[in-house]
Amino acid sequence: MKKVKRLFLVLAAVALTACNSNDDEVEAGIEIPGITITDDVDCCSAEEALQVYKFLQTVKIVPELSTEIDGKYNVFAYTHNGSFHNGYNELFFVATKKATGNYIKNFELTNITPTMHMVKMDKFHSTPTGPAADSFDNGILAVKRSWVSFIMNTSEAGSWTLSYDALVLGKEGKVEKKNIVVNALPDGQAWLKSFKVGDDVYFLSLVNPNDWKTGSNTIKAYISKKSNPITTPYALATETFTVDIDPRMPDMGNHTSPDNTPLVKQQDGSYQGTINLTMTGLWRIHFTVKDTKGNIVAGGEEELSSLYWDVTI
């Protein structure tokens, strides 16, 4: 009887261990549509996969920029609304194993290359482009992020293609010169501005104007430098600037607002500052670009600056 009891306890312990192991794999019964969770170390755990899945519900796929690699993997591209527009656009990428649908944690996405064909002149140029895609959130490593800021929209005058290289678990793949449509934004939403310093042309891309509300807001932008040759994506400028901002309300006596701080260069290459918007309506944000010595290199003083963004909140 004692032997039987001991055997029962051993079997119970084994069963409990097996149940706990299974729970570790699927993490208390998490189920995700189209995804099978296994003990594959290349892929996300159930909890990680759920985070990725939830994030992907907030963006939309760009089918023409998705691809298959080596018959085993898929790479999918997304933007916030599944399309592109003038100015700053974020691009997100995930890679999956076809066998399970699960998200691969580590893969590389490089050489993002947007190219415009100017039809009448039969010439080509690129546009400001972010660096190689990288995990934008430490909690969601399987989602890689980069960006493109389009200087022109698609029209009879010209069309856009986009290419990139992918490396997934040692296997190479690419999307090459896929046609994309870049839509024009409504009047008053020209959030990509250019300026010259000597013979060099720079582009200032405003990132987050749709997120602003009354009160204090973080203002974020990127400064890119036109490449030579111009068919090469315009990388972030290595030079350092300071961007003073002066927000005004042209429909309300051109009054300003207090407690704004300049955009200064961050470790990730972006420029960030603070803008304080005291009420709803149209704001014209004049900006003055200064070099490291404080000399004005573009724009002008305060509301006299010829460079500005219009933002309505």
What role is predicted for each listed range?
Residues N20-K120, W309:
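Acidic/polar, low-complexity intrinsically disordered N-terminal segments immediately downstream
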Residues A99-T100, L167-V175, L282, K290-L304:
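Short acidic/polar inter-strand loop motif in beta-rich domains
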Residues N153-I219:
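Surface-exposed beta-loop interaction hotspot
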Residues N89, K97-A132, S224-T261, G299-S305:
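Short flexible loop/turn segments that cap and initiate beta-strands
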Residues K3-V10:
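Sec-dependent signal peptide recognition
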